[in-house]
Amino acid sequence: MQQLQNIIETAFERRAEITPANADTVTREAVNQVIALLDSGALRVAEKIDGQWVTHQWLKKAVLLSFRINDNQVIEGAESRYFDKVPMKFANYDEARFQKEGFRVVPPAAVRQGAFIARNTVLMPSYVNIGAYVDEGTMVDTWATVGSCAQIGKNVHLSGGVGIGGVLEPLQANPTIIEDNCFIGARSEVVEGVIVEEGSVISMGVYIGQSTRIYDRETGEIHYGRVPAGSVVVSGNLPSKDGKYSLYCAVIVKKVDAKTRGKVGINELLRTID
């Protein structure tokens, strides 16, 4: 694996010179191997190590290099034709392979090659970009988008129209992460490398980026870039220091543990927020 990483790192330093016409065999094979490993879930752009999320930047570099070495090509679809550098994940799947990998794909869901979809996942008409990782038992609902390199945990529900931000550039930026057992309400957006920690519930229409204030009404604490585990979050506003105006924020209205979530439905958690 170290040799593969070295090839990617070296090629990335001269990426501006690389084109589909002049890409050498070693670089091309290394990039294709990484994309295949991401596609199968053997590698992932970010993973939790000793309780902390670690981003493997060299894998993002490989994804970026794939755009340098590949030319646009016609992609056949059921309703249309497309023209892009990245093939679709399921282009060569037959029924046996779908059965073996154990997930459902409802037309016209689109998944790019290099994204991993785990068993027991359901993809409604949605979009999953290259480098993303979608773990077991997750529902990606209608018109939801999982951006490039985003990491989605086990038993997550991404409701209709949810946007999970992608990140390829700037290179140092971390991917957006939704940990296990989270619920993201319809039309909400989580972007810019924000981490929604395990067991959190995000209400409909909540927008969270790195600069969004995440206000815990119980403690008065303000978080940035991280929704603490077990939070129930709704959209709100906080007043300015001079009291002349208010600005948007996300509000943690309560905390719940796994036992409570198991006994109480998501809708009930969001209804009883006073």
Curated annotation (Swiss-Prot):
Biological process per Gene Ontology, one example term: diaminopimelate biosynthetic process
Q: Which domain of life is it from?
A: Bacteria
Q: Which reaction(s) does its UniProt entry say it catalyses? A: (S)-2,3,4,5-tetrahydrodipicolinate + succinyl-CoA + H2O = (S)-2-succinylamino-6-oxoheptanedioate + CoA
Q: Does the keyword Mitochondrion apply?
A: no
Q: Which Pfam families match?
A: Hexapep_2, THDPS_N_2
Residues reported in the UniProt entry to bind substrate: 104, 141
Q: Which GO terms describe its cellular component?
A: cytoplasm
Q: Which HAMAP family match?
A: DapD (MF_00811)
Q: What is this protein called?
A: 2,3,4,5-tetrahydropyridine-2,6-dicarboxylate N-succinyltransferase
Query: What organism is listed for this UniProt entry?
Result: Escherichia coli O1:K1 / APEC
